[in-house]
């Protein structure tokens, strides 16, 4: 694909920053018996991720900060993913052990937090890895796509000129994957995209079927 001429274009980072803050809030708000790490660790992780993201916006996507942002974002996904799975395992252990420490409302709130965190962290990962990252997409230097969006096959009059997916598109991809548990309007093209969507769907399925359903049963009894 031919690159665009002129100064490089940078995608807005405020939606990503809001998502990171939301993930940190959800991880911090979990009950003590579910949370894996102390609160201060969550805050340290948050600042470590938000600093390079803010620097990318302030420096007009300077290459050095883009590199740091990509590494830190992928590390954040890894840490948040491990915490999410660990929190889910703790919830299931509490259910199987019939722990009296959590009532139905706490269990429902915790399962909702795990489900939303799952959606948000996978959305960030999809946004960061597809076609080489956001700036590669914005400037026409993107690599092989991992997903095919419906706008790419739509008539020219139906979409904006030189349309490229932004974070909101990947947020919707993450949400639809977790709700439908399958492919919707956006099609995975690579093996890693399919495996990641399978993993997200599996976490969402366990959260809904095992944890949330048990919470509803407790509240109804």
What are these regions (language model features)?
Residues 4-18:
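N-terminal membrane topogenic signal
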Residues 17-27, 45-53, 73-91, 113, ...:
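Hydrophobic alpha-helical transmembrane segments of multi-pass integral membrane proteins
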Residues 27-40:
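Short, hydrophobic transmembrane alpha-helix segments
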Residues 37-42, 68-74, 99-110:
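Non-cytosolic membrane-interface motifs at loop->transmembrane helix junctions
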Residues 50-64:
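Canonical alpha-helical transmembrane segments
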Residues 96-135:
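Pore-domain transmembrane helices of cation channels
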Residues 128-186:
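Membrane-proximal soluble regions of multi-pass membrane proteins
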Residues 164-221:
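Pore domain of cation channels
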């Amino acid at each position: 694909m031919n690159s665009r001429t002129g100064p490089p274009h940078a995608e807005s980072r405020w939606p990503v920053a809001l998502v990171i803050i939301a993930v940190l809030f959800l991880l911090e708000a979990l009950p003590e018996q579910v949370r894996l790490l102390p609160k201060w660790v969550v805050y340290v992780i948050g600042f470590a991720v938000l600093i390079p993201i803010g620097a990318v916006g302030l420096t007009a996507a300077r290459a050095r900060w883009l590199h740091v942002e990509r590494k830190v974002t992928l590390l954040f996904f890894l840490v948040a993913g491990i915490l999410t799975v660990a929190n889910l395992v703790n919830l299931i252990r509490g259910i199987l052990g019939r722990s009296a420490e959590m009532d139905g409302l706490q269990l429902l709130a915790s399962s909702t937090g795990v489900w939303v965190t799952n959606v948000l962290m996978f959305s960030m990962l999809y946004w960061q890895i597809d076609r080489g990252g956001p700036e590669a997409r914005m400037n026409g230097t993107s690599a092989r796509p991992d997903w095919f969006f419906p706008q790419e096959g739509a008539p020219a009059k139906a979409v904006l000129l030189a349309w490229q997916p932004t974070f909101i598109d990947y947020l919707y991809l993450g949400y639809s994957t977790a709700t439908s548990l399958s492919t919707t309007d956006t099609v995975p093209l690579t093996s890693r995209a399919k495996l990641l969507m399978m993993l997200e769907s599996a976490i969402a399925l366990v959260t809904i079927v095992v944890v949330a359903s048990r919470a509803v049963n407790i509240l109804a009894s």
